[in-house]
Amino acid sequence: MALVFVYGTLKRGQPNHRVLRDGAHGSAAFRARGRTLEPYPLVIAGEHNIPWLLHLPGSGRLVEGEVYAVDERMLRFLDDFESCPALYQRTVLRVQLLEDRAPGAEEPPAPTAVQCFVYSRATFPPEWAQLPHHDSYDSEGPHGLRYNPRENR
């Protein structure tokens, strides 16, 4: 099993979360909420208001999201779903696990940091780096930039 950090439309309550729950794609089990240990720019950009984590470590904000344990089949599905490597790149980053853990999960004695895969954007229009940086994402958030799901495009 691999750990994947999701920060946008794949989180619980967001438009694409259903793909993580679909067993036909493989297995994905929620482990905990998490926060990046290093700042990154999380921006909302493009005509479909997509949340992008720009691969600019050290700039932006600490980003909150969710950590999932996924099997190889789900990881391959997510690569395809995220158009990796053409659009997103799957990289590794360190995430601090937060208090909201899965039922039955062991409580660590102290804050725990784990390495996770994340889908981020290494190449992007330069102006994206100047967009407002967010520390968390919600499609219905106060930013007013509602995500346009693939099925509506």
Swiss-Prot record:
Superkingdom classification of source: Eukaryota
Bias (Basic and acidic residues): 132-153
Family annotation (InterPro entries): AIG2-like_dom (IPR009288), GGACT (IPR039126), GGCT-like (IPR013024), GGCT-like_sf (IPR036568)
Alphabetical list of Pfam families matching this protein: GGACT
Active site (catalytic residues): 82
One GO MF term: gamma-glutamylaminecyclotransferase activity
GO biological process: modified amino acid catabolic process
Reactions accelerated catalytically: epsilon-(gamma-L-glutamyl)-L-lysine = 5-oxo-L-proline + L-lysine
EC number: 4.3.2.8
GO cellular component, one term: cytosol
Sites where the protein binds substrate: 7-10
Keyword field: Lyase
UniProt-annotated stretches for the region Disordered: 130-153
CDD domains: GGCT_like (cd06661)
Biological function: Contributes to degradation of proteins cross-linked by transglutaminases by degrading the cross-link between a lysine and a glutamic acid residue. Catalyzes the formation of 5-oxo-L-proline from L-gamma-glutamyl-L-epsilon-lysine. Inactive with L-gamma-glutamyl-alpha-amino acid substrates such as L-gamma-glutamyl-L-alpha-cysteine and L-gamma-glutamyl-L-alpha-alanine.
Family recorded in the similarity comment: Belongs to the gamma-glutamylcyclotransferase family.
Subunit structure: Monomer.
Record protein name field: Gamma-glutamylaminecyclotransferase
UniProt organism field: Homo sapiens
Lineage, highest ranks first: Eukaryota, Metazoa, Chordata, Craniata, Vertebrata
